[in-house]
């Protein structure tokens, strides 16, 4: 058993607790990763607050990056010493996985949010030897070591800074993939992006890569809106001071070709649909608590408008994460501008700063 140090969510909506844990050796199809860093994502906080019913106590974290330390006997594509970014989990066996859409895996929710392996076990034990929930996105990377699978580990070139790339496995691939893999705007298109967090900012950068000539960002934070311009936005709207739908239609006279809702707010969801032109497509990527409802004008869809939900940017991580790294190398995806680093011991401060809007993408460094 490997000894590790982890942040554990023990109670609903309470600060995480730093504790020593034990981690079992990897099974035949698993790998043990020495975590170098892990991004903090909105979904981690939704689960901490039990918006998704993952059993507590639980080790969260799903934007991990690190070095492979051990591999199971059936692992063929990775060896100890490989650098990896960890992404979402999928079964690899269902029809969706076998036809190239693992983000629609029939066991997606179970694999990522069950808190255990499919057989009900978990490789994580507390200091008293009691099994606690983990396997979060098949990684639980708010820890110095994590068990993952070969499927959700993306091999990365060793000249790429490991501490930086973890968020590519979830939040950044979600925003960028929503644009490049799902909406697929043609050069010259217009897009409105609601929410200038990590997902929204990644979407801004991807919209510029795609050749959109009108990129409108809506948020409540002026500093974030200024940064949005720096990474590619052509227009910004502070929704505290302006009617966002009206302002968007003043910029794009007939409404925008595409919109992306990244806030998980039902009110903003309505605005993201209402600002569309005819036809137009709204992508929904905000991570709302289960049971959240929103209202829309059904008449909007009589004129060719489309609403599409986007999971993990409709990305195949082994293909898309390296693509994003290449865009970063070229200076076209400067996601490092979004990042602030924290030590694992400061995880609760990192979450507070993220929720307050002070920081866009916190990344936790592990002290080994």
Report each predicted region and the residues it spans.
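Rossmann-fold dehydrogenase core element
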Residues: 280, 295-337
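Glycine-rich beta-strand-centered segment in the early N-terminal region that forms part
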Residues: 24-38, 51-98, 103, 155-160
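Short N-terminal strand-loop motif that marks the start
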Residues: 1-67, 140-148, 152, 366-368
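Adenosine-nucleotide cofactor-binding segment
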Residues: 193-196, 205-271
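NAD(P)H dinucleotide-binding glycine-rich loop of Rossmann-like/cofactor-binding domains
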Residues: 23, 95-194
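N-terminal Rossmann-fold NAD(P) dinucleotide-binding loop
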Residues: 200-201
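C-terminal hydrophobic helical "lid"/dimerization subdomain
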Residues: 1-2, 270-274, 318-368
């Amino acid at each position: 058993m490997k000894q590790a140090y982890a942040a554990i969510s023990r109670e609903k909506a309470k600060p995480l607790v730093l504790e020593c844990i034990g981690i079992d050796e990897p099974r035949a199809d698993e790998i043990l990763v020495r975590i170098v860093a892990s991004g903090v994502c909105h979904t981690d906080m939704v689960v901490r607050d039990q918006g998704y019913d993952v059993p507590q106590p639980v080790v969260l974290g799903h934007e991990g990056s690190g070095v492979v330390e051990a591999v199971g006997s059936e692992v063929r594509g990775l060896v100890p010493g490989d650098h990896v970014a960890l992404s979402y989990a999928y079964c690899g066996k269902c029809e969706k996985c076998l036809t190239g859409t693992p983000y629609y895996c029939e066991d997606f929710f179970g694999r990522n949010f069950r808190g255990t392996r499919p057989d009900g076990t978990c490789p994580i034990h507390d200091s008293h030897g009691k099994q606690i929930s983990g396997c979060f996105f098949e990684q639980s990377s708010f820890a110095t070591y994590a068990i993952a699978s070969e499927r959700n580990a993306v091999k990365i070139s060793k000249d790429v800074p490991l501490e930086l790339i973890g968020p590519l496995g979830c939040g950044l691939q979600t925003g960028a993939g929503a644009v490049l893999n799902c909406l697929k705007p043609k050069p010259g298109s217009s897009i409105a992006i609601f929410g200038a967090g990590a997902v929204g900012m990644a979407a801004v950068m991807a919209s510029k890569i795609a050749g959109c000539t009108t990129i409108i960002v809506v948020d409540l934070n002026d500093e974030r809106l200024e940064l949005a311009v720096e990474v590619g936005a052509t227009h910004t709207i502070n929704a505290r001071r302006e009617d966002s739908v009206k302002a968007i239609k003043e910029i794009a006279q007939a409404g925008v070709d595409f919109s992306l809702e990244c806030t998980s707010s039902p009110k903003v969801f309505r605005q993201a649909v209402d600002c569309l032109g005819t036809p137009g497509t709204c992508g929904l990527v905000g991570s709302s608590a289960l049971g959240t409802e929103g209202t829309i004008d059904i008449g909007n869809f009589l004129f060719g408008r489309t609403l599409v939900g986007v999971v993990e940017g409709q990305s195949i991580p082994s293909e898309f994460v390296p693509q994003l790294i290449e865009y970063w190398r070229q200076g076209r995806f400067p996601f490092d501008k979004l990042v602030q680093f924290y030590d694992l011991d400061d995880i609760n401060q990192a979450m507070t700063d993220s929720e307050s809007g002070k920081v866009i993408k916190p990344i936790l460094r592990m002290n080994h």
